[in-house]
């Protein structure tokens, strides 16, 4: 015999972005609860609207399985005295298991007799276990929480009702002043309370009260309605997945509608129109058959088609007000030159402990120039980069960005184009913010990429200089994201980026240019270096590189980021080779024996005592001449070829000879080889089987 169990949490409207993850969390914790309580079950349907989270569990077992188990107790010599009487230990053990000493049997384990009790545990019924679901409800976590009434209890929103039905029977539970029952709520305006006769009635009963509880069905309905409106008007609609998800979690009974705005607003930059409609009002913008934006939008109301004309008029009025403001700001911004806006950045603080935004831009310009030389940019790209670096933050003081902060960079590109800046300069202004998330798009242009790296590295050096270093989960200036972005960009272009050396070089360049702003860039250089190495680890882990290889390639504090990434890829590419194990063992042996050794003598080949010493040294010298500055596949193959000479060397040579001169000479030779191996990190940490 199996059952259906319905559990619903009824709340005030939740923020849209919380609904889907909260439902998944509710499901996962319920599955864990059932598993912990040994209650078998079938499929679990998940339901959610802004006002509710609900689960319908199918084929729920009537009860737990009856269990028989043997419980081990103390040794026989402890359980009985010399006369065979039960001791307090035996009596207490049996009482604790709900049994008596008469139930005790003995079993021999490795020659020792132990007390055992055979227990038959009758399974609890589902009805007896399910009140524990209250703990699952209480355990849900949310990004923000609130209290209500006089209660100390916190939740995403106040809970107004609970439904807990095992088939047609209420499973009792109480949270604060809310008793679980069989009554749920229909649509806030169109429906009424619904008393459920059975858990299976849930979906149909709420649909009759203008609530579609299945998220997928509701989303499909929204999509179908939007596509129908678009077809009727011959529009193209970008059915953005994130916006569709958000709108879906704002409504219980969706009705899509079309609205319009004055054509004159199409003169506003498209990015502003999209932001106003999509981000601010949650509308879907429309294009004609040629892809040109039209003065129309599609919205979704939480209700039916009654009085839809009033709804449309209200939405059009709100959007028109936003667009009127945008048009005004757009006109005002064009009254000033880029030079005017750059000068105004002197009054804009980057951070009160660091400098103005104007000074930050000046530092970034110095860094960008230095990086351009290292990365081998052309003269044209260098000129474009220098121009972009001298103005790239100017849009921060524009009225449009003040009203729409999410358009910073985008408006900078647009205004730069209007002012006649070269396309490469304008594009770099937009791209310097990228990537805007851990897995966000990287800049497409070389100029934009270098500007993005320079800007982010200036931020890192500056915040570390004033000891504003991320700790734990605290990272208010998104420095981890910026550092991660730098590593991703370096990886894409395989550009050299030796963090430790680069910090010193940049600090010297800024000092020479008079652009340090009294910042002590030497204060936390080692901390920033380690910080960047950690981000390289993250990038490699995201590429599914083995943890031991990641650890091996990131041990060098002075390592180049590109070199770290290349070494990891090369080692990972060969990890399944049949000869990988002996190669790593041979190279690792060299690193282990030279670890912490400091030898200040030159290699004297006259002190070699066997042929293997000369053979390995000659091979090392020849390999060093062909080695690149950073790890390459050819370098790996060269080291691989040294595996046999290394093994032959150790078979014939006692490195730590009693004669100090011989020992120092051998270590000096091995240290030269170790320096080559260390291009790939500490390969002795690579796990081989």
UniProtKB/Swiss-Prot annotation:
Tagged with keyword Coiled coil: no
This protein's GO CC annotations: cytosol
Organism: Lacticaseibacillus paracasei (strain ATCC 334 / BCRC 17002 / CCUG 31169 / CIP 107868 / KCTC 3260 / NRRL B-441) (Lactobacillus paracasei)
Xref: Pfam families: tRNA_synt_2f
Subcellular location: Cytoplasm
Key words of the record: Aminoacyl-tRNA synthetase, ATP-binding, Cytoplasm, Ligase, Nucleotide-binding, Protein biosynthesis
Family annotation (InterPro entries): Gly-tRNA-synth_bsu, Gly-tRNA-synth_heterodimer
Family: Belongs to the class-II aminoacyl-tRNA synthetase family.
Enzyme Commission number(s): 6.1.1.14
Catalyzed reactions per annotation: tRNA(Gly) + glycine + ATP = glycyl-tRNA(Gly) + AMP + diphosphate
GO molecular function: ATP binding; glycine-tRNA ligase activity
GO biological process, one term: glycyl-tRNA aminoacylation
Protein name: Glycine--tRNA ligase beta subunit
Enzyme class name: ligase
Quaternary structure note: Tetramer of two alpha and two beta subunits.
């Amino acid at each position: 015999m199996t059952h259906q169990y319905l559990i619903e949490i009824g709340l005030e409207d939740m923020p849209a972005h919380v609904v889907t993850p909260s439902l998944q969390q509710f499901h996962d914790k319920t599955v864990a609860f059932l598993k912990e309580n040994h209650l078998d079950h079938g499929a679990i349907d998940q339901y959610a609207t802004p006002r509710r989270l609900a689960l319908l569990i199918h084929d729920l077992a009537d009860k737990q399985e009856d269990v028989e188990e043997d419980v081990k107790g103390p040794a026989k010599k402890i359980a009985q005295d010399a006369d065979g009487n039960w001791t307090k230990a035996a009596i207490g053990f049996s009482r604790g298991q709900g049994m008596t000493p008469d139930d005790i049997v003995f079993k021999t384990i490795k020659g020792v007799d132990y007390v055992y009790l055979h227990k038959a545990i009758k399974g609890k019924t589902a009805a007896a276990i399910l009140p524990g679901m209250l703990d699952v409800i209480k355990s849900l976590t949310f990004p923000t929480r609130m209290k209500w009434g006089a209660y100390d209890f916190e939740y995403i929103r106040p809970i107004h009702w609970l439904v807990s039905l095992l088939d047609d029977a209420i499973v009792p539970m109480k949270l604060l002043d809310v008793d679980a029952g069989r009554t749920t709520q229909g649509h806030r305006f169109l429906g009424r309370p619904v008393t459920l006769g059975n858990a299976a009635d849930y979906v149909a009963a709420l649909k009759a009260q203008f609530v579609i509880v299945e998220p997928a069905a509701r989303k499909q309905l929204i999509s179908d309605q939007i596509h129908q409106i678009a077809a009727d008007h011959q529009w193209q609609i970008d059915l953005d997945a994130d916006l569709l998800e958000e709108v879906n979690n704002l409504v219980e009974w969706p009705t899509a509608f079309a609205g319009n705005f004055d054509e004159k607003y199409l003169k506003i930059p498209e990015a502003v129109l999209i932001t106003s409609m999509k981000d601010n009002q949650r509308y879907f913008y429309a294009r004609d058959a040629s892809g040109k934006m039209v003065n129309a939008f599609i919205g979704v109301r939480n209700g039916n088609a009654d009085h839809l004309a009033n709804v449309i008029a209200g939405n059009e009025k709100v959007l028109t007000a936003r667009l009127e403001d945008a048009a005004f700001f757009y006109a005002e911004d064009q009254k000033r030159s880029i030079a005017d806006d750059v000068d105004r950045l002197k009054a804009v603080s980057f951070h009160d402990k660091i400098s103005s935004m104007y000074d930050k831009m000046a530092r970034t310009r110095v860094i960008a120039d230095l990086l351009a030389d290292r990365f081998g940019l052309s003269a044209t790209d260098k000129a474009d980069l220098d121009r972009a670096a001298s103005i790239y933050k100017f849009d921060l003081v524009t009225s449009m960005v003040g009203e729409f902060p999410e358009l910073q960079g985008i408006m900078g590109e647009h205004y730069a184009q209007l002012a006649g800046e070269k396309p490469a300069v304008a594009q770099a202004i937009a791209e310097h913010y990228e990537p805007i998330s851990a897995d966000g798009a990287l800049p497409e242009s070389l100029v934009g990429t270098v500007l993005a790296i320079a800007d982010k590295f200036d931020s890192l050096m500056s915040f570390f200089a004033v000891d504003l270093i991320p700790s734990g989960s605290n990272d208010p200036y998104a420095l981890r994201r910026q550092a991660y972005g730098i590593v991703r960009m370096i990886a894409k272009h395989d550009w050299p980026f030796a963090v430790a050396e680069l910090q010193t070089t940049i600090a010297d360049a800024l000092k020479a240019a008079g652009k340090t702003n009294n910042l002590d860039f030497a204060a936390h250089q080692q901390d920033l270096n380690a910080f960047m190495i950690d981000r390289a680890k993250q990038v490699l882990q995201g590429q599914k590189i083995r943890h031991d290889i990641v650890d091996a390639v990131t041990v060098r504090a002075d390592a180049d980021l590109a070199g770290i990434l290349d070494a990891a890829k090369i080692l990972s590419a060969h990890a399944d080779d049949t000869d990988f194990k002996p190669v790593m063992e041979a190279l690792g042996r060299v690193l282990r024996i030279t670890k912490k050794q400091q030898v200040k003598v030159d290699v004297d080949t006259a002190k070699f005592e066997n042929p293997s010493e000369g053979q390995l040294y000659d091979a090392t010298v020849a390999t060093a001449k062909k080695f690149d500055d950073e790890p390459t596949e050819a370098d790996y193959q060269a080291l691989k070829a040294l595996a046999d000479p290394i093994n032959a060397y150790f078979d014939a040579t006692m490195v730590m000879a009693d004669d100090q001169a011989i020992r120092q000479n051998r270590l000096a030779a091995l240290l030269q080889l170790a320096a080559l191996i260390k291009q790939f990190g500490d390969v002795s940490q690579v796990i081989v089987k």
